[in-house]
Amino acid sequence: NLYQFKNMIHCTVPSRPWWHFADYGCYCGRGGKGTAVDDLDRCCQVHDNCYGEAEKLGCWPYLTLYKYECSQGKLTCSGGNNKCAAAVCNCDLVAANCFAGARYIDANYNINLKERCQ
């Protein structure tokens, strides 16, 4: 669920508050359209698509609870997760790891979506 995703982000990117990823580019935050503005925004675009695939399985990605571990900045999804929990955990894990490897550009935070995300 979103609370667990926030904690995953904190695991892989402890130096930056999670909310910096909630309103970034065209895809980080609710919804998303247009062309991703950079690599970090592409992480969110992939995450959005992953949630879309989970929904096709009949899952509720924003609400699904899953089991995972964070150890020294490394995430693992637990093997005991059911189909939906495993799918959503994997979406969040991939995104959190992607965030850790992408450059954060302050100018892409809280952008004008109407102008830049056509």
From Swiss-Prot:
Its main location: secreted. It is an enzyme of class 3 (hydrolase). The keyword Metal-binding applies. Its cofactor is Ca(2+). Gene3D superfamilies: Phospholipase A2 domain. It holds the Pfam family Phospholip_A2_1. The keyword Calcium applies. Binds 1 Ca(2+) ion. Ca(2+) binds at Y27, G29, G31, D48. Keywords: Blood coagulation cascade inhibiting toxin, Calcium, Disulfide bond, Hemostasis impairing toxin, Hydrolase, Lipid degradation, Lipid metabolism, Metal-binding, Myotoxin, Neurotoxin, Secreted, Toxin. Its EC number is 3.1.1.4. It comes from the Eukaryota. The active site is at H47, D92. GO terms for cellular component: extracellular region. GO terms for biological process: arachidonate secretion; lipid catabolic process; phospholipid metabolic process. Expressed by the venom gland. It is found in: Secreted. Disulfide bonds join C11-C70, C26-C117, C28-C44, C43-C98, C50-C91, C59-C84, C77-C89. Belongs to the phospholipase A2 family. Group I subfamily. D49 sub-subfamily. Snake venom phospholipase A2 (PLA2) that causes myonecrosis when injected intramuscularly, causes neuromuscular blockade with a gradual contracture and a decreased sensitivity to ACh and KCl (in the chick biventer cervicis nerve-muscle preparation), abolishes twitches evoked by indirect stimulation earlier than those by direct stimulation (in the mouse phrenic nerve-diaphragm preparation), shows indirect hemolytic activity, and shows weak anticoagulant activity. PLA2 catalyzes the calcium-dependent hydrolysis of the 2-acyl groups in 3-sn-phosphoglycerides. PANTHER family: PHOSPHOLIPASE A2 (PTHR11716:SF51), PHOSPHOLIPASE A2 FAMILY MEMBER (PTHR11716). This is Basic phospholipase A2 CM-II. It comes from Naja mossambica.
